[in-house]
Amino acid sequence: MAIQFRSLFPLALPGMLALLGWWWFFSRKKGHVSSHDEQQVEAGAVQLRADPAIKEPLPVEDVCPKVVSTPPSVTEPPEKELSTVSKLPAEPPALLQTHPPCRRSESSGILPNTTDMRLRPGTRRDDSTKLELALTGGEAKSIPLECPLSSPKGVLFSSKSAEVCKQDSPFSRVPRKVQPGYPVVPAEKRSSGERARETGGAEGTGDAVLGEKVLEEALLSREHVLELENSKGPSLASLEGEEDKGKSSSSQVVGPVQEEEYVAEKLPSRFIESAHTELAKDDAAPAPPVADAKAQDRGVEGELGNEESLDRNEEGLDRNEEGLDRNEESLDRNEEGLDRNEEIKRAAFQIISQVISEATEQVLATTVGKVAGRVCQASQLQGQKEESCVPVHQKTVLGPDTAEPATAEAAVAPPDAGLPLPGLPAEGSPPPKTYVSCLKSLLSSPTKDSKPNISAHHISLASCLALTTPSEELPDRAGILVEDATCVTCMSDSSQSVPLVASPGHCSDSFSTSGLEDSCTETSSSPRDKAITPPLPESTVPFSNGVLKGELSDLGAEDGWTMDAEADHSGGSDRNSMDSVDSCCSLKKTESFQNAQAGSNPKKVDLIIWEIEVPKHLVGRLIGKQGRYVSFLKQTSGAKIYISTLPYTQSVQICHIEGSQHHVDKALNLIGKKFKELNLTNIYAPPLPSLALPSLPMTSWLMLPDGITVEVIVVNQVNAGHLFVQQHTHPTFHALRSLDQQMYLCYSQPGIPTLPTPVEITVICAAPGADGAWWRAQVVASYEETNEVEIRYVDYGGYKRVKVDVLRQIRSDFVTLPFQGAEVLLDSVMPLSDDDQFSPEADAAMSEMTGNTALLAQVTSYSPTGLPLIQLWSVVGDEVVLINRSLVERGLAQWVDSYYTSL
């Protein structure tokens, strides 16, 4: 709005000023005729009062500057004027009505109407009265003689108009006669007299006594009377404007018309006397100075004009301010609208968030209520068989503060506690059975290790009554009982390994009804709990892959550790696809659920484990968007299904299926229909029945290639010529850090089994490393007298002598990564001749040249012990330095071409 006003204002202002000037011009022009006639009347009065005796022009006195010059004869007393005017003859009254139109045509510069003017007798008295009113009126209508106005200046007299007037006048047919006693004024004098009258407004010479002058002025007086009757008095402003115009056009005034010579004797004496009498009376009255009045009027008019212009400017400014105020108001309204929109958006967002949160809470509450109701119903359906198990657990396992019914725990179970939702069990199967927890005291602490185990072997369930077996009746080999993928060995006070087998019996069903979080570390218990550990049931029920359950007792405790423990189970799916695999005890929950779902004797239920390889490009389709397809498979088949990633393998992933034979077959059938190109062969294999981990062959080491220069870093230095290096550019190197983290999480918890005694040489184990870390190590020597062993760190290098008790058994999945530390010897370098070992100075120099930098190594040959001999270079800027030669040049070693070969 303000911008439009600013653009229109400069255009509108000149237009307004032009319009005002046009109006002012025409208003002044309209008053031109009346002001001119008034001046003519004044000039006629001066001629009537002129002294006939004065023949020569008198000096002009500037009474009114810039306007007119007044002769001294104008100020003569009226008596003298009467004596001069009384001699004039009278003129017929018809002259007063016929001659003024001619003079009006001359003053206006327009040709008069040539039609004859009708004589109107009887108007002489009225005309004289009007003349008297015009001459003797108030000061506003009278023209002072001291400063007469020069109206004739601005009038152009044309000869044509004069001739027309002469022809139309009734006196044009009268022969011109010279009145006795009145000499005829020559044309030159008359023209000069008229010029003086036109510029000064009064005649200052003696020629004023001429009859034609008196006639002319009388006619002008008649015309002035008529104009006064119409205009009711001219304004001073118009007179002043005409005066200015007269001054500017004075050079264009034509001389007096010589042809107008009238007979003085025809003038009526009565008219002249009455006119002279009235003029004398008007002269007798004192007139105020016109100069002061005009100056005041001009000042007032200027002030009025200035005030008008100021008022207009103020009005324009006010309009501008109003426009600006309107713009500000519109901006404020826009801002208020934006603020309101933001408030509405915020309120809508809050309402939507509140509705979503309330709906989520309602769904969760409904789910928890259904699960709790189902658990309570299942617990009520359980008969005396369950009650016979409860007292035993409360007396032998559970403490007084933990003897709460399982239903109370189930009531607070979270939705993801592994319990099936209503409608999930397979068709035709009875309601699942719920059992009282035997391991409640073992799960009293929160979880610390959330790394789940994926692979597991088949497990059959045994009755909880087996827990009543006294601890002294346990077999001698109970210390090395096999554990499943979710079992952890517990340590007794005598540091004897007593594994806790949690899978047999109804005790495993506690994980399906308990609301507590599952964890590997939660199975750690007191010696009292370990004393009642039951033995494995002797059963010969075969697995689906032909392995007998009875063979489990011959397996070592280490074999229960699967290679998929640290794998990522999500595979891009949501937590629903994972169900209960977020802890070490997830297997037992599924087993108990499937056993209860089958509705058969737990002793006769087999758990089938089926694993298939899934190419990487099919993993996303198998999981589905947000895990929907995996969830569909689990709900439809009733089996436990999840996707795991094999460590250090990116091309394929493993689909793990657990459940009964019926559930597994149904899941495989659904998968085979969707993925016809997928190989459904079971790749799962149970652990080998070995008591101890065999020593790994040298192929498990990541060795340096022969004859090829590779980039290495030195991770450990035995001496100046004996080093351990890592190939930090190898594809498997990045997995070492992840392996270190997983080993730290696993072995920092208590209850991990130690190495069996006697310790076998070359066995791989987990040993404490630097800064509390756990590293992979190999036993290279044993000292039975001190119960110590010497180990070699297979990833970070170095030798160390430690107690056997500090070593721990290593899980099989922790040894799948090739050993990253390569043991090497410097080629062609040997200690000085007097020493069998390198000096400390040589060791320090070697450490300085190889520390915290990447080096280039190349295998040249092998030592008699099988260690590779290498040439080692360091790159300093653009210079490559051979470290082998540098040691010799510094005098810290000697160069021998075949030192290790001669040994």
From Swiss-Prot:
The modification Phosphoserine is found at residues 105, 107, 151, 169, 429, 445, 573, 592. GO terms for cellular component: cytosol; membrane; mitochondrial outer membrane; mitochondrion. Residues 1-29 form a transit peptide. One of its GO terms (molecular function) is protein kinase A regulatory subunit binding. The keyword Mitochondrion applies. It comes from Homo sapiens (Human). Residues 344-357 are annotated as: PKA-RII subunit binding domain. Residues 117-128, 187-200, 274-284, 309-340 have a biased composition (Basic and acidic residues). Interacts with SLC8A3. Interacts with CFAP91. Interacts with CLPB. Interacts with NDUFS1. Residues 107-116, 513-526 have a biased composition (Polar residues). Residues 96-128, 175-210, 225-260, 274-340, 513-544 are annotated as: Disordered. The modification Phosphothreonine is found at residues 70, 447, 533, 590. RII-alpha binding site, predicted to form an amphipathic helix, could participate in protein-protein interactions with a complementary surface on the R-subunit dimer. This is A-kinase anchor protein 1, mitochondrial. Binds to type I and II regulatory subunits of protein kinase A and anchors them to the cytoplasmic face of the mitochondrial outer membrane. Involved in mitochondrial-mediated antiviral innate immunity. Promotes translocation of NDUFS1 into mitochondria to regulate mitochondrial membrane respiratory chain NADH dehydrogenase (Complex I) activity. Pfam families: KH_1 (PF00013), TUDOR (PF00567). GO terms for biological process: antiviral innate immune response; apoptotic process. Isoform 1 is detected in thymus, prostate, testis, ovary, colon and small intestine. Isoform 2 is highly expressed in testis and detected at much lower levels in kidney, pancreas, liver, lung and brain.
